[in-house]
Regions:
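Accessory nucleic acid-recognition modules appended to NTPase machines
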Residues: 1-111
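Hydrophobic/aromatic beta-strand patches that form the interior of the parallel beta-sheet core
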Residues: 45, 94, 115-117, 144-146
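A short pocket-lining beta-strand/turn micro-motif at the edge of beta-sheets
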Residues: 102-104, 112-115, 139-142
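Active-site ExK catalytic segment of metal-dependent nucleases
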Residues: 113-123
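Catalytic cores of nucleic-acid endonucleases
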Residues: 121-156
Length: 156
């Protein structure tokens, strides 16, 4: 769905309404004014992938979907946020990206240290490393590659 043809204020208003109704939530980009980090970006996620699928009008089985990575990322992040809320863990949640497109899918900040999560639908693609600009700049408590095989450790 391309939103660039719509008035940005109208899009913002609708996203704000959906957020107030607990249909979607937004993650802000994490930045501490390092020159190459995105400072203003936000990502929108659905609390329920079924609503996401309905909006996109796509109920194709996962094995046939071209957006399985985005679905997996949306699923894990929404479940992790629900888990943290349920457990009383009020870590600040972000994503991180540089102008060179280096990215960490999801970050939790708690007591000045960070836990970084990278989502991979394919369990064979877990040889992911923390981008060096992040590793060199911030205290990293843990880096986790989340797959369908291990996600329950972080959501239940």
């Amino acid at each position: 769905m391309f939103l660039s043809c719509y008035d940005p204020k109208t899009v913002e208003k609708y996203i704000d309404l959906l957020e107030k109704c607990f249909v979607v939530f937004r993650l802000s980009a994490f930045s501490r004014n390092v020159r190459t980090e995105l400072k203003k970006g936000r990502k929108v996620f659905f609390y329920d992938n079924g609503i996401r699928n309905a909006v996109l009008q796509n109920f194709t089985p996962l094995a046939l979907r071209s957006d399985v990575g985005a679905l997996w990322e949306n699923f894990f992040i929404s479940e992790r946020i629900k888990y943290n809320h349920d457990k009383g863990n009020y870590a600040k949640s972000y994503f991180w990206r540089t102008t060179q497109q280096q990215e960490i899918d999801y970050i939790e900040e708690c007591d000045g240290a960070f836990t970084a999560f990278e989502m991979k639908w394919n369990p064979k693609k877990t040889s992911v490393t923390v981008p060096s600009p992040f590793k060199n700049e911030y205290p990293l408590r843990q880096f986790v590659v989340v797959t369908p095989e291990n996600y329950l450790e972080w959501t239940v």
